[in-house]
Amino acid sequence: MFKALIGAAVVVLLAVLSKTRNYYIAGLVPLFPTFALIAHYIVGKGRSLDDLKTTIVFGMWSIIPYFVYLAALYLLVERFRLETSLALAALAWLVAASVLVGLWVRLHA
């Protein structure tokens, strides 16, 4: 229930920010590391320090799929409807994330 309330609060915050003079800040709010904090706490409490550091480094590399998503969306919004652009950009993220995981597994196995 608490997570749902936080999620709802974030949605309201995004809606409010999108109507302000500084609407672009709405793009920063989803990047608050809520899930990263949870993941790092769980890994940090349940695994070794080396495992935590590996998780942190992988998190650094995970910025690449997000960049691919943003770049794709930037290019697509002028060519397609917003919904189509969002779906295609999400697909681009999925492909980039799959490549990242595949390379990570291959290089760190």
UniProtKB/Swiss-Prot annotation:
GO cellular component: plasma membrane
Source organism of the structure: Pseudomonas aeruginosa (strain ATCC 15692 / DSM 22644 / CIP 104116 / JCM 14847 / LMG 12228 / 1C / PRS 101 / PAO1)
Record's protein name: Membrane protein GlpM
Phenotype when the gene is knocked out: Mutants are pleiotropically defective in alginate biosynthesis from various carbon sources.
Species classification: Bacteria, Pseudomonadati, Pseudomonadota, Gammaproteobacteria, Pseudomonadales
Subcellular location, record wording: Cell inner membrane
Family recorded in the similarity comment: To E.coli YdgC.
Coiled-coil zones: none
Parts of the chain that traverse the membrane: 24-44, 56-76, 85-105
Topological type in the membrane: Multi-pass membrane protein
Keywords: Alginate biosynthesis, Cell inner membrane, Cell membrane, Membrane, Transmembrane, Transmembrane helix
BP GO annotations: alginic acid biosynthetic process
Function: Could play a role in alginate biosynthesis. Overexpression may be lethal.
Alphabetized InterPro entries for the sequence: GlpM/YdgC
